[in-house]
């Protein structure tokens, strides 16, 4: 896949993306415990039966889209190792299945930067889903935030719980859990009640959760995070998230600059 020059890739230190088409005639195994990715061609790994897997649902592209069970409902999801976290819940799927999800918080803003830059601000919900079943392995109390995208994603965190094998040639998906039994995922994620991203050649508040909606505004300039000046910080999501993640405990502060005045604002992590 050839894409135009993009600072997103430069910040990551990578030159591009390998899509599913690169593995169209292969079987790819992700094994986090061994810290390896194995590509088999053209044969399946030994002792792996076609009947042990489930079908890939995308008939036209080499995308790892499969059916999982969300409560008592079938849900198409894309397994994507490029997506952080466990569940990235699309707003459309949430709206369709809202009666089985518990909303714990509301927000407004931009969820994240992508290869095409920042999206538009949207309404966001923080939710907890009672159960997701992936090939017989049940994950309970699964937390996520809603995201405007084409479909729900199961992200790279799935690899913490089992080996994933994708047979692109025979269009089969396998999940082999490391342990038996249900896994409690801990509910809605604990996130800072504001998010900060590079925008308009500075750092701005780009997501506001309910507890902060009367304290800060979308687009407020942030010049300091918990004692770390952003003056020389690289204009990247990774850089600012590294600073946020380094804040000890569940409380901290930011300094915003508005109308040439600086103001210290307390922030905290919330579910």
Feature locations, PLM:
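Pepsin/retropepsin-fold aspartyl endopeptidases
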Residues: 1-271
